[in-house]
């Protein structure tokens, strides 16, 4: 149902949405987000001076792992069979920003929007964690759903992707 808080019952108590009568369909979702790095962090990342390993690859791995664990992190999120995750972190030396995208696909009774958003969020948090020893001057921003397909509510596409 649109227009209501579907995870609350009539008394306002939390509940998991009943999906028992829904048919499996192909579902996709794409989310994006940014980490803006302070000058010192950006310079050291551009120079490959991380002592903890490849920051972007580790963030990508963390984001993929998070997609698979979304129902453990979001209490009322259904566990679904993830069929594909494509998570990418790209660093712009000119802006000092890391652009993160996460695309998720499944064939199930509920969508994968939360999984895509969780992947981006955890990848961004991993960048922060790996770089905070240099400086806390970082901003995580712009995490949003770019698109989704499948399901009763139909397709969705946000306007104005910000990719650099």
Where are these regions (language model features)?
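C-terminal binding/interaction regions
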Residues: 1-56, 61-164
């Amino acid at each position: 149902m649109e227009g209501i808080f579907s995870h609350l019952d009539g008394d306002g108590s939390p509940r998991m949405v009943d999906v028992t009568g829904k048919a499996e369909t192909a579902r996709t979702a794409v989310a994006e987000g940014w980490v803006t790095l302070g000058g010192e962090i950006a310079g050291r990342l551009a120079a490959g001076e991380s002592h903890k390993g490849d920051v972007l690859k580790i963030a990508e791995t963390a984001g993929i792992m998070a997609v698979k664990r979304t129902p453990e992190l979001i209490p009322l999120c259904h566990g679904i069979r993830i069929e594909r995750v494509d998570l990418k972190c790209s660093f712009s030396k000119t802006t000092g920003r890391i652009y993160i995208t996460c695309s998720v696909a499944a064939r199930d009774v509920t969508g994968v929007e939360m999984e895509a958003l969780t992947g981006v969020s955890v990848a961004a948090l991993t960048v922060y964690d790996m770089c905070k020893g240099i400086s806390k001057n970082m901003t995580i921003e712009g995490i949003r759903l770019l698109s989704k397909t499948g399901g009763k509510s139909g397709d969705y596409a946000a306007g104005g992707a910000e990719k650099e």
